[in-house]
Amino acid sequence: MGLLAVSRDSGDTLLACRAGDRFIPGSNQKLYTLGAFLLEEGPAARSATRVAARGKVKRSRRPDGTTEVALRGDLVLHPCGMPDIVPLLAPGSRGLLDSLAALLWTGGLRRFEGTLWIDRGLFADEAPPPGWAHDDFGYSFGAPLNPLLANGNAVLVTAREEGGRVSLSFEPSGSSLDLRDAGILVGPPGESGWLIPRWIFGTRTLELTGLVPRGGTVRRGVAVSDPDSAAAAWFLAALRREGVDVKKAAVAMLPAGRGSGGRGEKPRNRPPATGTIAFGDPPAVEGWSAV
């Protein structure tokens, strides 16, 4: 156990016990973290996740007076560092990404062809700290955080037995996840099934062992190893669900920051982007800039 208590008035250390060590957070850690945030920022604190657009824009006027926008160029997703923790209400849904896609549709976006950039400059790109239980990495509750998603950094794996063979699938689809059967047995009908996930570090391969009853199905929530690329894939999927025609879309990552004080260094090689659209207000068509 480690503990550090600091006076908010003077800044003096009141109590320190292994204060410099890093530990696996307890399940009640969120209470202290949330309490500290509310004390510092207040319950009315808000921060904006932004989408910026750069490229060639074609506008067309519809008979009903609305304007439709076709963008050929870049979309840049700038997270604010407040990950989405809303309930996942539907298969494949990701609350924040779904909301952004809906705002873009409301603003007139009907077609996108180009590159989706994910700004990774806010959080440090570092491995889990020493002492973290490796067995937790594969499970959904052990999923890594990124500035966009918290409980959304996971997928639901389904193992289904048919004809003596076990097939594996996951939802939502789109993330670059490679599932590998590392020893899933077929048990008698009606037997309780189970799955144990294990990541192959340095890859996007997830090995699964377990047991599936004959003719049955077993499901398990598992973590994604690269939440940034997964968020990009799910954002494009959310755009498609809204009705945006996504053509030949590529995904690119801006460099990760150092995460100093929660404010990572500015990422280098940032593509120039204009027409910033703030999350929270429907993006106006005039917010798109043609270059």
Which ranges hold each PLM region?
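A short, well-structured edge-of-sheet supersecondary motif
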Residues: 1-17, 251
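Short glycine-rich, polar/acidic loop-and-turn segments at beta strand-coil junctions
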Residues: 7-9, 27, 38-41, 81
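Short active-site loop at a secondary-structure junction
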Residues: 16-36
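Conserved serine DD-peptidase/penicillin-binding transpeptidase domain
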Residues: 39-291
